[in-house]
Amino acid sequence: MGAITLDGKATRDEIFVDLKERVAALTEQGRTPGLGTVLVGDDPGSQAYVRGKHSDCAKVGINSIRRDLPADISQAELDATIDELNANPECTGYIVQLPLPKHLDENAALERIDPGKDADGLHPTNLGRLVLNEPAPLPCTPRGIVHLLRRYEVEIAGAHVVVIGRGVTVGRPLGLLLTRRSENATVTLCHTATRHLPQFTREADIIVAAAGVPHMVTAEMVRPGAAVIDVGVSRDDNGKLVGDVAPDVWEVAGHVSPNPGGVGPLTRAFLLTNVVERAEALARG
């Protein structure tokens, strides 16, 4: 018997129904949320991501604010665009689409974002607030992972979660999220240089693979019945996009998130959620 599929697309659609109602209520008050994007250059992947985010906005009634800039823009011109969105009352939250061209300073750009308008939840100030368990926009992918597990009633409280990956977008903040009292998981943070990795994963109730190594998690590394979340994105030798979880894991695990179609749709859903939540907070005063 194969694993139960953790369906991110269906779960995203449920979130969108809720967001559409909340946005409609805000619009009645004259407070329609606005999501901004800053896209530099013409990278096809980045363009596709940005199009997808604005398509999502249209589905739930959020206003789209696009700032598409040429690849040869200067740091000063990029900074001016960020400052404009920080000051723009129509923009509730926004993102700077990465990667930026190599002549631009990504960290400087991200730190220039108003933390209150940080739709990704990855501003250093907001990550610090997560450490301190203070209210702040939450990182979208870790939030999506927790929501997906709860949607399918995978027990988190008391669970041993092994996270493979130490990046700032998933691995590090996910550990912070899962060890809050509201989640109460025990987290082991591993990575590509972890010795004897299978010894850790075989003890896990939940495995989150976010290392970007094709099919690194195999069936022999998974305890029967465990939940496995595949967040990794990389390309195999043929140039095909693949995740971190090998196909044979589906025969051993109790729950598996597909990739694509698992966590990715929820990352985008919680980008919108962060914007709507800020609009609601502003409406409350």
From Swiss-Prot:
Keyword Heme attached: no
Enzyme Commission number: 1.5.1.5, 3.5.4.9
Top-level taxon in the UniProt lineage: Bacteria
Coiled coil regions, renumbered to chain: none
Cystine pairs: none
UniProt keyword Amino-acid biosynthesis present: yes
Reaction catalysis annotation: (6R)-5,10-methylene-5,6,7,8-tetrahydrofolate + NADP(+) = (6R)-5,10-methenyltetrahydrofolate + NADPH; (6R)-5,10-methenyltetrahydrofolate + H2O = (6R)-10-formyltetrahydrofolate + H(+)
Alphabetical list of InterPro entries matching this protein: Aminoacid_DH-like_N_sf (IPR046346), NAD(P)-bd_dom_sf (IPR036291), THF_DH/CycHdrlase (IPR000672), THF_DH/CycHdrlase_cat_dom (IPR020630), THF_DH/CycHdrlase_NAD-bd_dom (IPR020631)
Family: Belongs to the tetrahydrofolate dehydrogenase/cyclohydrolase family.
Protein name: Bifunctional protein FolD
Taxonomic lineage: Bacteria, Bacillati, Actinomycetota, Actinomycetes, Mycobacteriales
Gene that encodes it: folD
